[in-house]
A protein has these predicted regions:
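N-terminal secretory signal peptides that target proteins for export/translocation
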Residues: 1-5
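Bacterial N-terminal signal peptides
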Residues: 10-25
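Extracytoplasmic small-molecule ligand-binding "clamshell" domains
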Residues: 31-104
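Bilobed "Venus flytrap"/periplasmic-binding protein-like clamshell domains
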Residues: 35-64, 126-201, 275-276
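Periplasmic-binding protein-like
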Residues: 35-44, 111-112, 116-132, 181-187, ...
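Short helices/loops that flank or line small-molecule/ion binding pockets
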Residues: 78-96, 109, 190-217
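A ligand-binding cleft/hinge motif common to bilobed small-molecule-binding domains
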Residues: 97-110, 163-169, 202-231
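Ligand-binding clefts/hinges and TM-proximal coupling segments of bilobed small-molecule sensing domains
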Residues: 151-166, 263-313
Length: 313
């Protein structure tokens, strides 16, 4: 019964929702590419939690887009970038909120383009920090040959895509390890996924791996890097800044809808009625135009992601 219940819940989440509440309807009816419907998408491993984060902002946006014919909103989750790419190409999703790395993957496949930067907790850009134990003898990325590094998970921008790309740019070859006890071949950098920032800092502190990576925001958070650990660590490199998150739209979205969506999202930060919806939307504080610096950072990140997919994964 539990398994059946989970399958039913997953099905209802895929079916999406109207602007007021989820509806029970056949799949094709719920995701039809109606001109009056704005569909917000997200690549998700936790659809229920993400639905609750997305819905308030969608509820805020839709009534403000009546002038371009939008009267209804729906949410559609995808399990991975490939499925989301399919949704975008087929017009089943109009707007996607994603990490910078995932956004560049969708853009590379030609199904979406960046709309706005997303500022969360007052931060629109961040960077990746590489760190090691002070007594490790590691002072730079060049010292990582024959050593090991802990990433977070294979979807993380700050704790996988950016640092892995940085290592490749330094001429280092990455080799996945079976466990922290495994050692890389001579001349390569062995890597593992630790699943959380706290695990990363713990593994480095306990010498299970030689180097860890995370965003500068997580590096400064004592819940991710306990103060008892920090005194034993040294930062060996910090990357350039890159966007924290992006809003994407499908490549063939009606220009009038795209323009109005951009306008509504940018103006939301100054509207008291949007405050709670923005907070629920991954603690968003405002949406920002994509300037030349952000474009360059996204292009560099996108090239790195494609190189990782070709040479590492």
């Amino acid at each position: 019964m539990v398994a059946l219940h989970r399958r039913l819940v997953a099905l209802l989440l895929v079916l999406g929702a109207t602007i007021t509440a989820p509806i029970l309807a056949p799949l094709q009816a719920a995701i039809a590419n109606d001109a009056h419907v704005l569909v917000l998408g997200r690549i998700s491993d936790d659809p229920k939690a993400h639905y609750e984060q997305l819905k308030p902002l969608l509820d805020y946006v839709v009534p403000r887009m009546a002038g371009v014919g939008i009267r209804e909103g729906r949410i559609l989750m995808a399990r991975d970038a490939q499925q989301m790419n399919s949704y975008l190409r087929r017009g089943r999703v109009d707007w996607v909120t994603e990490t910078a790395a995932m956004g560049t993957q969708l853009q590379h496949r030609g199904s979406a383009r960046p709309l706005l930067l997303t500022e969360r907790d007052g931060v629109s850009r961040y960077r990746t920090v590489f760190f090691a134990r002070r007594d490790s003898g590691i002072a730079s990325l060049a010292d990582l040959r024959g050593r090991s590094i802990a990433f977070q998970n294979p979807f993380s921008t700050s704790a996988y895509y950016v640092p892995a790309s940085e290592l490749l740019d330094q001429g280092l070859r990455l080799e996945i390890l079976l466990s922290p006890m495994d050692r890389p071949a001579s001349g390569t950098v062995g890597y593992l996924f630790a699943r959380s920032e706290l695990n990363i800092s713990t593994w480095v502190h306990k010498r299970l791996v030689d180097v860890g990576v995370m965003s500068n925001l997580d590096w400064q958070n004592p819940q991710r890097v306990p103060l008892a650990f920090r005194k034993d660590f040294i930062v060996i490199r910090e990357t350039q800044e890159y966007p924290r998150a992006v809003e994407m739209v499908r490549s063939n979205l009606d220009p009038k809808v795209e323009a109005r969506l951009r306008e509504v999202l940018v103006e939301a930060a100054g509207d008291p009625d949007a405050r709670e919806a923005l907070l629920r939307f991954f603690k968003t504080t405002r949406f920002l135009p994509i300037d030349a610096t952000a474009e360059q950072a996204l292009a560099h990140l996108g090239a790195g992601v494609q190189r990782i997919r070709a040479e590492v994964e």
